[in-house]
Amino acid sequence: SRLPAALRETIGRYFRDQVAVDPDHEFVVYPDRALRWTYKEFDERTDNLARGLLAIGMRPGDHLGVWARNIPDWLTFMYATAKIGVVMVTVNPVYKSHELDYVLKQSDMKALCVIDAYRDVDYLKIIRDLVPETLTQQRGYLESENYPFLKNIIYMGPEKHRAAIACRSSCCWEAMCERRW
């Protein structure tokens, strides 16, 4: 190929090479959370999440939305979706109800990952209002009249808020990351 080597390189391939070359080197650092992951730790975490996404029915080409501010989980979803060929749809963290409604209808999202809130935006309330089925349907079997592609809500947050989005109908982030097949 006539392309320079740097243009032929993918982020995934570069990341895998770094894991092989220097697995114990820090890759993710969030000082405000006292969080540090090495290449190896992050690789394992994203592999586990990728397996969890496959287990809930995500397939190459499917769209997964992430509605969150800049947090470690956002980065984890970015790499996990790339590993399995799922398209990550980033949702602006300051979007309100009408904007999320538009994105859900236009993006064919099969799953939406959310945190509880950001600034003055209560994500969980917006989800309950837009997708009331989350309050009555079982986890993993979401059938929404307004969003026919949407099958799962994945909540990334503290256990104390799980009931706010009816855990019966949402996939739990920690459970997905901890699964090992």
Enumerate the language-model features and the residues they cover.
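A generic structural signal for well-ordered alpha-helical segments
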Residues: 18-19, 81, 104
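AMP-dependent adenylate-forming
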Residues: 14-38, 158-161
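Conserved AMP-binding/adenylate-forming core of the ANL superfamily
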Residues: 27-79, 98-101, 169-175, 180
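Flexible, low-complexity linker/hinge segments
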Residues: 2-10, 164-181
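Short, flexible loop segments at the rims of nucleotide/cofactor-binding pockets, characterized by
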Residues: 3-6, 41, 89-92
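Aromatic/hydrophobic pocket-lining residues that form π-stacking "cages" and hydrophobic walls in ligand
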Residues: 15, 77, 127
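Short, histidine-centered active-site or binding-site loop motifs used for metal coordination
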Residues: 1, 31-34, 108
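Structural core segment of the AMP-binding/adenylate-forming
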Residues: 56, 84-172
